[in-house]
Structures are given as C-alpha cells and as structure tokens.
C-alpha cells in the first residue's frame, strides 16, 4: 500500500504533484442525494489558495475545482466523486539546482532513500500543494454534514505564530475572517503582521499553532481503543505537511494539572448532561461528549528559505544550497483551512460509522440520561 488514502466509510484518496498537470481527490463513500456543486467547494478552496496576500507564497493558482464523476444534476450519486484541480503557474526552472541536492528540512532525502527516484519540481508529492486536494474533499464533507447534521460548525484559526500567542481574554471568533492570519485576536493580528514583515525581509520563516473547533457534534461519535475519534483526528492532522505535533483539548498542558483541576465535572441541564469545563477537548474514552471538539496542531517553520545551508548531493559530496522559488514565510496561515477540511472529513466519517453500527437517526444516542 502506498498510503495515499484516509478514512473508513468516507474515504479520500489524493493524487498529483506540485508541478504536474493537475492534482485532485477521489472521494468514496459520500451518501447519495447530497447537494454538491463546484461553487460550494470552491468557496473553501479560495480560502487556501496561494497568492492572496503578501504573507503567503506568490505562486498564482486559481485552484478551480472540476467535478468529473459521482454527481448528477447537482446531487451525489453514491459513487466515487472525482475532483480535479489543474496546476497553471508552475516554475519548474526554479528547482533545477535541487535535482542533485537535498534540501535540509524537506522530504527530498527520505523520498530518495525510500523510492530511489523523486520529482524535485516543487517537492513533487511531498509539497503542501497536495493539501488543495484535501480542502476540496473537505468541501464535499462539509456539504454532507450540512445535510445530515446541520448544527455542526467547524472553525479553524491560528493561536500562535513563532513565540507570539494570542490573548485568550481577547478571543473573538468574529475576528477570524477579518485578518490575513485567521487569528481570533485583533491586537495579535497587528503584532504578527509586523513580526512576519521582518522575517520576510530577512528571507527567513516561522512556525505556528492552529486550533480547529467542531461545535454542534452529537455525543457518541467514536469507538473504544483502536477506533477512537481522537485517534483519527490526531492521525488526520499529523498527516498535514509540516505538522510536528497534535493536541486534543488541553493536550500537553494537562500533564501539569491535578486530577481535581482537570476533571470536567458533570451536572444535569435542561437538555441533558452539561460539563463545567472542557479540558478533555470534547472527547472521553475516544467518544465525543457533545461538547466542542478541540484539536491543535503545530507546524514547523517553512524549510524553503533564502539562508544558505549545508547539505549533500546524491553522490554524497558536501554542498551548499539556497532555496529559490516562491514559498510561504509561515505555512501555518494556509494550514488553517486544511485543518478544517481534515476535521470535516473525520467527523463525517464517524457520523457514518455511528449510523452504520448503532442505527437510528444521526446524532441519536442509545444510552438515555434523565
């Protein structure tokens, strides 16, 4: 297996390279009768596409999605949905110098060691360009969620850029779409702009932390031990290019808490169980509680920088490399809609799994309380 697919019942396979003629996704398992149109998917792709401001790569790609199969008269047929995005602004000549050299921090050397062949143009299959296909697939998942569980809302945002985090006291989701960093803190957005301007001018890059929140989920999604909702969410986020760490709820910070501080106490509300806090990130024992599911992931600094670095060639000789081409000074910015897409795909997958195993209406729990 070459591991280009993810999901159980809602299964996505992505294909294509950064500088190939096209890339895309095959979405298998979308329920029939879902309203699916290219314009709706395009909305999500437009949030990820490059060249929208000075803080992202200046590669100009329209990222226009084409639906090749699985949709008839605007509705899903239950057969595989093939999505394609044509590449139109490749500059393969920018990568001539790295055909024989390995870029530090990139997958060049590991792809070569594994396969004995690699596409050096823009990183080939290992390029973050692959995430456009994920966002397209996530668009299909969002449309299915809107039809099956309209209450579900998925929102991603940046909570840290380099050493600079947001002020949680100023947290305001209404600010997310008002700045180029998808940050829910207006003051932080201004500070980050000045910080990233300095890094851009020096030819350097920086990492980030992205948080993705799914609200309106029913309790009961996920399964014990090996089918945990958080297991699949962690794997989905970890599969995104440049991601080096994933947390659910308080994550690593929970290790510093006492049991009494970490406990999300339960009481009975008018509409069922309610919790005093959400340290667990909406998941207990691998199963959703009905609270917001909260996931964070950290992306490393973009490895494509203008600073000269030591490396070796395929022949093993010492070399120096400066990465040319057009690159993101902070890949975390465009990782926000990618994280949202992965959340949508995993959540829909588990809703379909729950329906298949337990039966009944979507979101209906078997164990009644009160």
From Swiss-Prot:
Its cofactor is FMNH2. Keywords: Amino-acid biosynthesis, Aromatic amino acid biosynthesis, FAD, Flavoprotein, FMN, Lyase, NADP. It comes from the Bacteria. GO terms for molecular function: chorismate synthase activity; FMN binding. Pfam families: Chorismate_synt. Its EC number is 4.2.3.5. One of its GO terms (cellular component) is cytosol. NADP(+) binds at residue 48. It catalyses: 5-O-(1-carboxyvinyl)-3-phosphoshikimate = chorismate + phosphate. Pathway: Metabolic intermediate biosynthesis; chorismate biosynthesis; chorismate from D-erythrose 4-phosphate and phosphoenolpyruvate: step 7/7. It is an enzyme of class 4 (lyase). The keyword NADP applies. Reduced FMN (FMNH(2)). GO terms for biological process: amino acid biosynthetic process; aromatic amino acid family biosynthetic process; chorismate biosynthetic process. PANTHER family: CHORISMATE SYNTHASE. Homotetramer. This reaction introduces a second double bond into the aromatic ring system. Belongs to the chorismate synthase family. This is Chorismate synthase. It comes from Jannaschia sp. (strain CCS1). The gene is aroC.
């Amino acid at each position: 297996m070459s591991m280009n697919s993810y999901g159980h019942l809602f299964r996505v396979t992505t294909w294509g390279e950064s500088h190939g003629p096209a890339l895309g996704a095959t979405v298998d398992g979308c329920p029939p009768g879902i309203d699916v149109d290219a314009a709706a998917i395009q909305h999500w792709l437009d949030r990820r596409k490059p060249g929208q401001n000075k803080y992202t790569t200046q590669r100009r790609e329209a990222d226009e999605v084409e639906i090749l199969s699985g949709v008839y008269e605007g509705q899903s047929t239950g057969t595989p949905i093939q999505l394609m995005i044509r590449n139109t602004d490749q500059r393969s000549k920018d990568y001539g110098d790295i055909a024989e050299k390995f870029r530090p921090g990139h997958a060049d050397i590991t792809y070569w060691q594994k396969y004995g062949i690699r596409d050096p143009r823009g990183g080939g299959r290992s390029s973050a360009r692959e995430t456009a296909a994920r966002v397209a697939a996530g668009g299909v998942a969002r449309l299915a969620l809107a039809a099956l569980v309209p209450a579900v809302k998925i929102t991603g945002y940046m909570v840290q850029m380099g050493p600079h985090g947001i002020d949680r006291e100023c947290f305001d989701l209404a600010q997310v779409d008002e700045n180029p960093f998808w940050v829910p803190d207006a003051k932080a957005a201004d500070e980050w702009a000045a910080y990233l301007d300095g890094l851009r001018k020096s030819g350097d890059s920086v990492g980030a932390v992205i948080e993705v929140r799914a609200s309106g989920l029913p309790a009961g999604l996920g399964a014990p031990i090996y089918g945990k909702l958080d297991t699949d969410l962690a794997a989905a986020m970890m599969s995104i290019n440049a991601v080096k760490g994933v947390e659910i709820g308080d994550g690593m910070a929970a290790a510093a808490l006492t049991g009494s501080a970490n406990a999300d106490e339960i009481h009975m509300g008018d509409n069922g169980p309610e919790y005093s806090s959400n340290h667990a990130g909406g998941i207990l024992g691998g199963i959703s509680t009905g609270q917001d599911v909260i996931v964070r992931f950290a992306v490393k600094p973009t490895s494509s920088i203008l600073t000269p670095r030591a490396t070796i060639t395929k022949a093993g000789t010492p070399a120096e490399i400066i990465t040319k081409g057009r690159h993101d000074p902070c890949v975390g910015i465009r990782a926000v809609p990618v994280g949202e897409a992965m959340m949508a795909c995993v959540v829909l997958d588990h809703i379909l799994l729950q329906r298949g195993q337990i039966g009944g209406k979507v979101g209906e729990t078997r164990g009644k309380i009160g």
